[in-house]
């Protein structure tokens, strides 16, 4: 299946490094971007979540990765960046394009891409200021395993409408958990 043009453009731009540096007022811009993405995810709802209660699943969101006091700003930004990349990948699958309205999906890609761009610019500034490891390997693994469980769930449920609705609601929940980044 051919990828939507906006997805291809986002992938091309993602592969290029930003030559300009954005101001790192991340908590404000990140919050606004999250609000836009959450609104889009809300608009993507096609069926009532109540009709899918039998399909509920605990994907084991690694909340400890996003607890603000545990990490310094670069590690928190890196964790959120990995999460957004995984969400982008999840909604870029063939099964996803068949499940959602293409216009809303394109807007979601754009919103996620904007988030990634802001995080990358901010991360490069933060790492330049202090030489700290970007993300604890255990945290990175926890985020990736979480999304692997979601992908496996979708596969086991044969990408059914209810499975996608459960995943959409889960992504909204986990995405909103990552909105509060440390200020320093």
From Swiss-Prot:
GO terms for biological process: adaptive immune response; B cell activation involved in immune response; defense response to virus; humoral immune response; natural killer cell activation involved in immune response; response to exogenous dsRNA; T cell activation involved in immune response; type I interferon-mediated signaling pathway. GO terms for cellular component: extracellular space. It holds the Pfam family Interferon. Gene3D superfamilies: 1.20.1250.10. Its main location: secreted. Residues 1-23 form the signal peptide. CDD domains: IFab (cd00095). Disulfide bonds join 24-122, 52-162. Keywords: Antiviral defense, Cytokine, Disulfide bond, Secreted, Signal. It is found in: Secreted. GO terms for molecular function: cytokine activity; type I interferon receptor binding. Produced by macrophages, IFN-alpha have antiviral activities. Interferon stimulates the production of two enzymes: a protein kinase and an oligoadenylate synthetase. Belongs to the alpha/beta interferon family. PANTHER family: INTERFERON ALPHA-5 (PTHR11691:SF60), TYPE I INTERFERON (PTHR11691). This is Interferon alpha-3.
